[in-house]
Amino acid sequence: MKVSVVLAITVLALLSVAYASEFEEKELVKEVVRTIFLGKEDAALREETDRECKWYLGDCKAHEDCCEHLRCHSRWDWCIWDGTFG
């Protein structure tokens, strides 16, 4: 019983490390592709437009990341409607 619990915890730890490194690799590839195809100046411009605002169900870390009338869901980190109208 103890061995299976330790084994399960070890597997989960390894999976989380693998996922984190895969995420970093994807971000690096995205940055390299932007630089190659758009040039450095255009890549910087593209990053600014990416940071403008996130639409409904877009990923976010704070309420400011989301567009108007949306807020960042505290548990799932995506933009949801805040219940207000224009």
Curated annotation (Swiss-Prot):
InterPro entries: Huwentoxin-1 (IPR011696)
Source organism, top-level taxon: Eukaryota
Positions carrying Phenylalanine amide: F85
Paired cysteines (S-S): C53-C67, C60-C72, C66-C79
Alphabetically ordered keywords of this record: Amidation, Disulfide bond, Ion channel impairing toxin, Knottin, Secreted, Signal, Toxin
Residues annotated as signal peptide: 1-20
Subcellular location: Secreted
One of the record's GO molecular function terms: ion channel inhibitor activity
One Pfam match: Toxin_12
CC terms in the record's Gene Ontology section: extracellular region
Propeptide section residues: 21-51
Tissue: Expressed by the venom gland.
Function summary: Probable ion channel inhibitor.
Protein family membership: Belongs to the neurotoxin 10 (Hwtx-1) family. 42 (Jztx-44) subfamily.
Free-text domain note: The presence of a 'disulfide through disulfide knot' structurally defines this protein as a knottin.
The protein's name: U22-theraphotoxin-Cg1a
Lineage, top ranks: Eukaryota, Metazoa, Ecdysozoa, Arthropoda, Chelicerata
